[in-house]
Regions:
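C-terminal substrate-recognition "lid" of short-chain dehydrogenase/reductases
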Residues: 216-245
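Alpha-helical segment proximal to the catalytic Tyr-Lys
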Residues: 127, 175-176, 236
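Substrate-binding pocket helix/loop in short-chain dehydrogenase/reductase
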Residues: 97-99, 103-111, 197, 204, ...
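Short, small/polar-rich loop/turn modules that mediate ligand/substrate recognition or access, typified
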Residues: 178, 183, 238-240
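Catalytic Tyr-X3-Lys loop
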Residues: 100-119, 141, 166, 214
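Active-site helix of classical SDR
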Residues: 122, 162
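Residue(s) in the substrate-gating loop at a strand-loop-helix junction
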Residues: 145
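Conserved glycine-rich cofactor-binding loop
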Residues: 15-16
Length: 249
C-alpha cells in the first residue's frame, strides 16, 4: 500500500458489487473503510481480502439513510483515522415498476437511501475534510447512473430520477466546496456485470447489450478504476465532472 495518501478512503455500500470493487482497488493506495447495512459477512470478507494483500481496512455497520445510524458510523471511523475520500455508492433501485404502478413506500425508500443518504454522507465528509472545518481537504465521488440521462422508462424512472438528483448535487456541491480543498465528481455507470443484472434472463441481457456500442457489459473493476482516478491526485484539476462509463450508450 502506498503510504503517502492521507486518511481513509470510505465507500458506502461497500460489501459487494461496485462498492466492493472500489474498496479493493483503493486499498492499493489508501487505508479503506466500508459502510454496510446488512451484509456483515460480505463486508468482512472484503476487509479480509484487503488485509491478506497487505492493506488496511475496516468494516462499519451504518445505514446511510438513517441519520442516527450514519452518525454512529462516522463516529466509529473518527476513532480509526481521518477521512480523505468519500465514495457515495450505497443505493437501491426500488424494483422494476412503471410510474402508474409505483408505490409510495418504494419511492420513499429509494430517496431515503439514494438521495438523503448521499447528502447526509456528503455533509459529514465536508465537516471532516473542509479547510473551513480545520480539515486537510479531500475528494467526494458519487456513484450516479446512466439512468439519470436515459430515464429508464418502463423499468425504474423513480431510480433514474434519484440519480438525476445526485448529478445536480455533484455539480452544486463541487462549486460550494471548491475553495475548501474538496473536489466533488460523479461516475455514471451503464450496464455493469453485477448481481442485479445476473438476475435477468439471457434473452433480457442480450437485448440490453445489443444497444451498447461497445457490445458488452462493463465490469465493476472498470468502474472502480474510474472512481479511484477521480479520487486521486492525478485528477487534481477535475471537479464537478459527471464521468460517463456506459460503453458509448
Amino acid at each position: 500500500m502506498t503510504k503517502d495518501r492521507f486518511g481513509f478512503f470510505l465507500v458506502t455500500g461497500g460489501s459487494r458489487g461496485i462498492g466492493a470493487a472500489c474498496a479493493l482497488r483503493a486499498a492499493r493506495d489508501w487505508p479503506v473503510a466500508i459502510f454496510y447495512r446488512e451484509r456483515t459477512e460480505e463486508a468482512h470478507q472484503v476487509v479480509r481480502t484487503i488485509e491478506c494483500a497487505g492493506g488496511t481496512a475496516v468494516a462499519i455497520q451504518a445505514d446511510v439513510g438513517d441519520e442516527d445510524s450514519l452518525m454512529r458510523g462516522f463516529e466509529a471511523l473518527d476513532k480509526v483515522g481521518p477521512l480523505a475520500v468519500l465514495v457515495n455508492n450505497a443505493g437501491v433501485t426500488g424494483g422494476v415498476s412503471r410510474v402508474d404502478t409505483l408505490s409510495a413506500s418504494a419511492l420513499q425508500e429509494v430517496y431515503r437511501v439514494n438521495v438523503i443518504g448521499a447528502f447526509l454522507a456528503a455533509r459529514e465528509a465536508v465537516r471532516r475534510m473542509s479547510t473551513q472545518h480545520s480539515g486537510q481537504g479531500g475528494a467526494i465521488v458519487n456513484i450516479s447512473s446512466g439512468a439519470s440521462v436515459l430515464g429508464s422508462p418502463n423499468n425504474w424512472v423513480h431510480y433514474a430520477a434519484s440519480k438525476g438528483a445526485i448529478d445536480t448535487m455533484t455539480i452544486g456541491l463541487s462549486k460550494e466546496v471548491a475553495a475548501e480543498g474538496i473536489r466533488v465528481n460523479a461516475v455514471r455507470p451503464g450496464l455493469i456485470d453485477t448481481e442485479l443484472q445476473r438476475g435477468r434472463s439471457a434473452e433480457q441481457l442480450q437485448k440490453m447489450i445489443s444497444v451498447v456500442p461497445l457490445g458488452r457489459m462493463g465490469t465493476v473493476e472498470e468502474i472502480a478504476e474510474a472512481v479511484v482516478w477521480l479520487a486521486s491526485p492525478a485528477a487534481g484539476y477535475v471537479t464537478g465532472c459527471l464521468l460517463d462509463a456506459r460503453g458509448g450508450l
